[in-house]
Amino acid sequence: MCIRDSIKILVHDLGAAKMAEMVEAEWAQIKDSVLALDQATIDAIERQFAPPVYEALPDDSTAVEQLRRADFTFARWLTANVAPHKQPGHAIVTLSLKPVGGAPGDATAEQMDAVADLADAYSLGEIRVSHAQNLVLPNVKRKDLPELYQKLVALGLATANIGLVSDIIACPGLDYCALANARSIPVAQLITERFADLARVHDIGDLKIKISGCINACGHHHVGHIGILGVDKNGEEFYQITLGGSEASDAALGTILGPAVPYGEVVDVVEGLVETYVALRHKGERFLDTYRRVGMAPFKERIYAAA
């Protein structure tokens, strides 16, 4: 259980007023104190976060440009999964753990062993795990991108979908968590199967779907462009849909679309929301932009008008 969930439980058990009283009492004891660290300790901490030694490289790579022009799938991966690096001649590569039909964030032991070797060979020995349930190689030389890409393809880790509709965040849900009201992983798997066509996925563009199996919100559903929250209705799995959430600098909590829908309808609902966005969007608009411009009404009408 994370700290956020522990705080929720404390507030529920103690009441908001008592919790506030305890926080203020603790703050009164520490607000005028000073955290004193000797210079040796500060220096030791700083050494733990020292940047790696980068090779001086040009920003451009002939090999990358040639393959980008010759191989559309590489070009698509380059656009979706490779981000700029502050160090010239380097790039940040995200390894998608969201294949079609896969459990979000899942990797086999063989894949993990291989990624460790790739980190040593291409990323100065460093791997990071993103909050979006993917892996990141943060220090890749741009000239090595074609070779790294081919190895990721062979491992099944080169799905070009970072930040797109099939790059779903999901908690373990009812399959693995005693707190959950409904399953999360199978919902994510079904959505990725519905949106298996990468050309369609890229045409849809930036769209973040987040799924939580209960109100503890471990899947961050409340800040998803499309949020999906599992609820229990008389022992049956239902899902409350929210729209318009964001965890970015324009942070917002999603707004409830309407009555919760049963498990068997979730994928159709998501597709209906996406199709509504595609029909209404202006050139260059993301799902979130279109939602903020047109509001909830057209999305609600699409999902509930025939009910």
Model-derived segments and spans:
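Peripheral terminal and linker regions in Fe-S/redox and tRNA-modifying enzymes
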Residues: 4-307
